[in-house]
A protein has these predicted regions:
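Short catalytic/ligand-binding loop motif for oxyanion handling, primarily in non-cytosolic enzymes
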Residues: 21-23, 77-79, 110-114
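Conserved GTP-binding G-domain of TRAFAC-class P-loop NTPases and closely related GTPase folds
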Residues: 121-145
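Conserved TIR/SEFIR loop-to-helix hotspot centered on a Trp-containing motif
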Residues: 74-96
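Conserved N-terminal substructure of TIR/SEFIR domains
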Residues: 1-71, 90-100, 105-107, 137-154
């Protein structure tokens, strides 16, 4: 039985570098309980149907999202599209309180001076996922943090 029967699931948008796709998939697996409980529905650009205009699809989804996850790595920071388009729009929506932006530190990189550097990051202590001895523990910590953010939105 869904824990959220009367509420619509909150749209979660993944902003990430395609070089981090495997880590995005691992995170998605750890969010399965939140999806089954109808607390969230997730979206990323690999879900764009053939023939759709990808920039419009991304713009629409980032503007609909209640939670925007920035999956941080050196590749994310090096991506002009992630940095200049997705992250910029995400932070605009965050500042207007239209969405919650959560940085997820996937791999070690110099992110602290970035525009999102003032936001509380996950996992615990902003320790990069790939540095945890057990990645499942890192992704569980992230999933719990996302659940708490979702509960605050309801």
């Amino acid at each position: 039985m869904p824990l959220n029967p009367s509420e619509q699931p909150i749209q979660v948008f993944f902003s990430y570098s395609h070089k981090d796709e495997a880590l995005r998939d691992e995170l998605s697996t750890h969010l399965a309980v939140l999806k089954r409980q109808r607390l969230i529905r997730e979206w990323h650009d690999r879900q764009i149907p053939a023939g759709d205009v990808w920039k419009e699809a991304i713009d629409d989804r980032i503007n609909e999202a209640g939670v925007i996850l920035l999956l941080i790595s050196a590749d994310f920071l090096a991506s002009d599209y992630c940095h200049e388009i997705e992250m910029k729009r995400a932070l605009e929506r965050h500042e207007k309180r239209e969405a919650v932006v959560i940085p997820i530190i996937l791999r070690p990189c110099n992110w602290q001076g970035s525009p999102f550097g003032k936001l509380q990051a996950l996992p615990k202590d902003a320790r990069p996922v790939t540095t945890w001895p057990n990645r499942d523990e890192a992704f569980t910590n992230i999933s719990e943090g996302i659940r708490r953010a979702i509960e605050r939105l309801q």
